[in-house]
Amino acid sequence: MQTKETNGEKDRFDFYAYLDRMKFIRRWPLMRCTRDENIMEHSQCVALITHALCAIKNTLYGGHADEGKAVLYAVYHETSEVMTGDLPTPVKYYNRGIQGEYKSLEKLACEKLVATLPAELRESVAPYVFADENSEEYKIMKAADRFAAYVKCLEELRGGNAEFLKAKASIEADLHSRKMPEVEYFFEKFIPAYELTLDELESL
């Protein structure tokens, strides 16, 4: 009697088990943090803010961003790190040579990761793991990625951790430099609430 294994078919696929390990990959590895953050919770934060930015752009500024595509870009944007780990930003962007090599490593990790899916499912997932970096949705997701880092800075500063002062200023300048009206709207309407306590939020 032939089994799937003897037919050359796999019984086990590791893709989602790999992604579940995102909760073990710590962000900000060179920084002292009052609370550790992993790439799984970071990706959730990026997905929420990505959806918000798309809604703002489409509703208030006449945009036509594909919200579903943008949010799925956010969900998968850190998945390569289950194989590479989180390389500190100062190292990743130290020079163009290192940046280029790391991009190649990320691409290889993504290819290996997608290969752990059944062949018939890869076409449904791969477009979000390998995001179109020239698309409007990708640009929105990258802004949301920066917002998620900015929110982390606010959290650390509220906890008395001055280690994040420079990062906060740098990220804020980067976000404003993008000249995206949806980014400015999010800054004005939503960011102030991130600095409130729970009691203050409930009293609004």
Place the predicted regions along the sequence by residue.
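Alpha-helical, largely C-terminal catalytic domains
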Residues: 1-204
